[in-house]
Amino acid sequence: MLDLRYITENTEDLKKVLELRGFKEIGIIDELKSIIQRKREFQKEADILREERNKASKEVGKIKQSGGDITKISASVKLVGEKIKEIESKLEQEENALLNINLGLPNILDPKVPPGKSEHDNIVQYEVGKIPTFQFVPKTHFEIGEALHWIDFEKGVKLSGARAYTYWKDGARLERALMNFMLDVHTKEHDYTEVWVPSMVNDESMMATGQYPKFKDEFYRIDKDELNLIPTAEVPLTNLYRDEIIPEDQLPISVTAHTSCFRREAGSYGKDTRGLVRVHQFQKVELVKFCKPEDSEEEHKKMLSHAENILKKLELPYRVIILCSGDISANSSITYDIEVWMPGLNRYMEISSVSNFRDFQARRGKIRYKSKDGKNQLVHTINGSGLALGRTYAAILENFQNEDGTLRIPEVLKSYF
């Protein structure tokens, strides 16, 4: 959802952004400008008529006091009132049309975002850690997990169908250890406040963060109760401050939560059908920040370093890439992905996305702060995975495997076992 002034004053720039994103309905911007213009004209006409009605109403009062006949002027007031209702109805129609189009528009791109059409055009920023070498052919995480009897995919499928799994014994303990380790680092070292949030949210929450209305088919919904299973803790964490005005001296606010996440993975048929990479339910530790606009770039960098710090402590090799215009999410202005090395799969795999949304979500969710001069302004929101537990789990299995089938546990996790 974009600023209407920006749309009207930067039409050609906006069209270029949409083209870079691969947005096909470029002509909708001209339609949007026409709606904005009609809305202004209706608003102006309604204001003039209200002023006319107010003057006439005062005149009615004066005539009444003097004992005169108000029949004619009362009829005139009534007629003006009917015209106002008619214009207000048209105004409401234009406002609804405006909102529907604006809710479907993607965010403005940061100038640093490289042009491109797909993930193949993303640019590697840097690599961290040494890729391990093995004196044997490394196994995949699902082979290791099944051999250790830590992961049982068959029982997961029996319970929930495809893309499901169960953890057992030390395998279950490893997942719990990762959760506690990540939360401890983020709360004790990175100064985030831990929050426990619901796994079901209302439509307003999904709308504010940008999942609805455009991507409604990608998520699980409980129609009877009008609730949605969260695809990420970004949704409930960001909506903690929906429709609120935050005092300036409370910013920046940094919150974190561990939750289950639920995704239909409707567009991923045939991709990563085995293992923990692409599943319908997974655990994740999420990071969200609310800050002043002038601080968002620096806070974005900080969050990226916080997510990286988890991988550094776990001694997992990774790289950071910047997403191109054709691969970045519609809601984000700029996104850095962290990809961890997977020896068994013999490729890098996304383990975290860290995004700056600028005021895109704040405008949808009416999340504002009151500045020292008393003005209400939109905050900027930033979010990132810190990290996805299942993929971190998979990376540990593949990077810390031994030739005899045993597994080494990262030093930082040993105290959690």
From Swiss-Prot:
Record EC number: 6.1.1.11
Q: Which reaction does it catalyse?
A: tRNA(Ser) + L-serine + ATP = L-seryl-tRNA(Ser) + AMP + diphosphate + H(+); tRNA(Sec) + L-serine + ATP = L-seryl-tRNA(Sec) + AMP + diphosphate + H(+)
GO MF entries: ATP binding; serine-tRNA ligase activity
| Cellular localisation | Cytoplasm
Where L-serine is bound, by residue? T232, A233, E234, E286, S385
- Tell me the keywords, alphabetical order: Aminoacyl-tRNA synthetase, ATP-binding, Cytoplasm, Ligase, Nucleotide-binding, Protein biosynthesis
In what pathway does it function?
A: Aminoacyl-tRNA biosynthesis; selenocysteinyl-tRNA(Sec) biosynthesis; L-seryl-tRNA(Sec) from L-serine and tRNA(Sec): step 1/1
Its main subcellular localisation, reduced to a broad class, is cytoplasm
What CDD domains does the entry give? SerRS_core (cd00770)
Family membership noted in the UniProt record = Belongs to the class-II aminoacyl-tRNA synthetase family. Type-1 seryl-tRNA synthetase subfamily.
The record's note on quaternary structure and interaction partners says:
Homodimer. The tRNA molecule binds across the dimer.
What does the entry's free-text domain comment contain? Consists of two distinct domains, a catalytic core and a N-terminal extension that is involved in tRNA binding.
The job of this chain, per UniProt, is described as: Catalyzes the attachment of serine to tRNA(Ser). Is also able to aminoacylate tRNA(Sec) with serine, to form the misacylated tRNA L-seryl-tRNA(Sec), which will be further converted into selenocysteinyl-tRNA(Sec).
Q: What is this protein called?
A: Serine--tRNA ligase
Q: Species name for this entry?
A: Leptospira interrogans serogroup Icterohaemorrhagiae serovar Lai (strain 56601)
